């Protein structure tokens, strides 16, 4: 059964098959999570088998909520499914909208609810190899520099978050600690 995501069609929010939303460049809902340990962020390299942006580095996890699923529930679900992470408190940080070509004729036009969570760097992580190639902790400012110097290694959305929305996302995190 195809995965149905919330997308806007003719101004109405309705369930649309995920691949169709990307093929048509429809504006759709998404979530992104950043797990932080102080000034370090856990990032993941997307699995080679992903249908877009395979092998590129992204934030801790990101996905689309299922039709009828709350964004906060989706964030917790994907931390568990992609990385085996449970028990973290995710806090809504901001909402960002962007549109980006992700290759192979696919467009991400997302309205993204962004969540942050604090964790120790020794947090147990068990990546699902279908989703995640590898993970690493990196200082947030080092990551921003790395993205600027080697943008081809990173997903379009991570580049956008760090270039255009870093203070909006991570400034609020410092208040949460």
UniProtKB/Swiss-Prot annotation:
Active site: 62, 110
InterPro entries attached to this UniProt entry: Idi_bact, IsopentenylPP_isomerase_typ1, NUDIX_hydrolase-like_dom_sf, NUDIX_hydrolase_dom
Necessary cofactors: Mg(2+); Mn(2+)
Gene Ontology molecular functions: isopentenyl-diphosphate delta-isomerase activity; metal ion binding
Subcellular compartments: Cytoplasm
Top-rank EC class of the record's enzyme: isomerase
Pathway(s) per entry: Isoprenoid biosynthesis; dimethylallyl diphosphate biosynthesis; dimethylallyl diphosphate from isopentenyl diphosphate: step 1/1; Porphyrin-containing compound metabolism; chlorophyll biosynthesis
The protein's name: Isopentenyl-diphosphate Delta-isomerase
Biological source species: Cereibacter sphaeroides (strain ATCC 17025 / ATH 2.4.3)
